Amino acid sequence: MITVRTIPELRAAIAAHPGTGRPGKGRPAFVPTMGNLHDGHIALVRQARPLGDVLVASIFVNRLQFLPYEDFDSYPRTWEADCAKLEAAGCDIVFAPRESDLYPEPQTFKLQPDPQLADILEGHFRPGFFTGVCTVVMKLFSAVFFASGGGTAVFGKKDYQQLMVIRRMVQQFALPVEVVAGETARADDGLALSSRNGYLSTAERAQAVQLSAALRALAQAAQAPGAPPLAALEQQALQTLAQQGWAPDYLTVRQRHDLQPPAAGAAAGTLVALGAARLGSTRLIDNLEF
């Protein structure tokens, strides 16, 4: 495994990789991360391994997707541990640009995603978040896939809305990138693995599973014969979580394909329950397809 910092170094490393010398081959598989890797990230890397001829993972904490009061400065940087995990998972190239490598000048040209998809849920509570995500992902896609003419990128379902936004971006710009979804990795008690779980106190960690439990309960209630309107079920779920000591932003059921409220009688297998809530000072998100 090798590490590169700049876009020219990355493109040269991809071109020089032994896998790119075979006829008809040379397409990268790519997993973007912000570092502080856990088993969920590594599962995505292992999933990506057979999907390309050279496996690239990026580590870059993207300032553009943090709000001024969020944890950009305190976000854990665990470089040596991350590299060891990536190498063990079969990664070929780690792209770890400095901020000056990816943003050599002020990023005044940014991507504005579809507001119907990006200004709801996470986008409502974190305005500008998906502009930052789309801008950096477009830059990373350009860096990784430009020379090869395309490839595969793996994103986790844990960040469900982000996955939908990236897929829409790829579709709208006709990018030669296949976006593959990875299942959410969970702890034994059901808590979705997240880099921010490390912020939880011991007591909060024991309580954190309540978020995934609330989503399961909401999904089950929504599917029950003669169920009340979704708005009433969502309000009840919010109240229950608040009574347990959380500060919820949203608990809601949406259509998977566009994250809009479902039509009456929506078929099973087309919906997703999504939630975001703060436990103490830590904001967690999760989702459940059903």
Swiss-Prot record:
Q: Which reaction does it catalyse?
A: (R)-pantoate + beta-alanine + ATP = (R)-pantothenate + AMP + diphosphate + H(+)
Which residues participate in ATP binding?
A: 34-41, 156-159, 185, 193-196
Highest taxon in the source lineage: Bacteria
Kindly give the Gene3D superfamilies that the UniProt entry links to this protein: HUPs (3.40.50.620), Pantoate-beta-alanine ligase, C-terminal domain (3.30.1300.10)
Pfam families cross-referenced by the UniProt entry: Pantoate_ligase
- GO BP, one annotated term: pantothenate biosynthetic process
EC number from the UniProt entry: 6.3.2.1
Sites where the protein binds beta-alanine: Q65
Q: Where in the cell is it found?
A: Cytoplasm
**What molecular functions are annotated in GO for this chain?**
ATP binding; pantoate-beta-alanine ligase activity
Can you tell me which residues bind (R)-pantoate? Q65, Q162
Q: What is its main location?
A: cytoplasm
Its subunit composition reads: Homodimer.
Protein family (similarity comment): Belongs to the pantothenate synthetase family.
Protein name (record) = Pantothenate synthetase
The coding gene here is panC
